[in-house]
């Protein structure tokens, strides 16, 4: 897979996590406690601008799923993906960085849109 283009056109701020499978993978399924490798692009809903992308660093993000190493929207949204899959996550600020945001990077109260590619799963 290659770096996705993330569009916010026609997207409204959700109150709950929105999960859209763009491609269902055929590899191992990601479960809580697994170490996962995820390539992603993240944009803010308000301006559609990219604030982060693992693709630009040439290396996926590795984390343990479901233990709070990432924002809650990711812990919930990546679970159930299969290796080789691509999923769009529309994450309300309550499941991201909340009213404070990340100064200079993400505005307070911002809805975040991620397109995530699950590239690896390692068992517990």
Predicted feature locations:
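Cross-family detector of peptidyl-prolyl cis-trans isomerase
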Residues: 1-124
């Amino acid at each position: 897979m290659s770096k996705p283009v993330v569009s916010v056109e026609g997207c409204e701020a959700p109150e709950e996590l929105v999960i859209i499978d763009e491609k269902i993978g055929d590899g191992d399924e990601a479960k809580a406690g697994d170490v996962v490798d995820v390539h992603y692009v993240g944009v803010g809903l308000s301006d559609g601008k990219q604030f982060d992308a693992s693709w630009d660093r040439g290396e996926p993000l590795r984390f343990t799923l479901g233990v709070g190493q990432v924002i809650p929207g990711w812990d919930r949204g990546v679970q159930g993906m299969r290796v080789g899959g691509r999923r769009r996550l529309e994450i309300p600020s309550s499941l991201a960085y909340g009213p404070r945001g990340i100064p200079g990077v993400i505005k307070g109260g911002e809805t975040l849109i991620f397109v995530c590619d699950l590239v690896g799963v390692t068992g517990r």
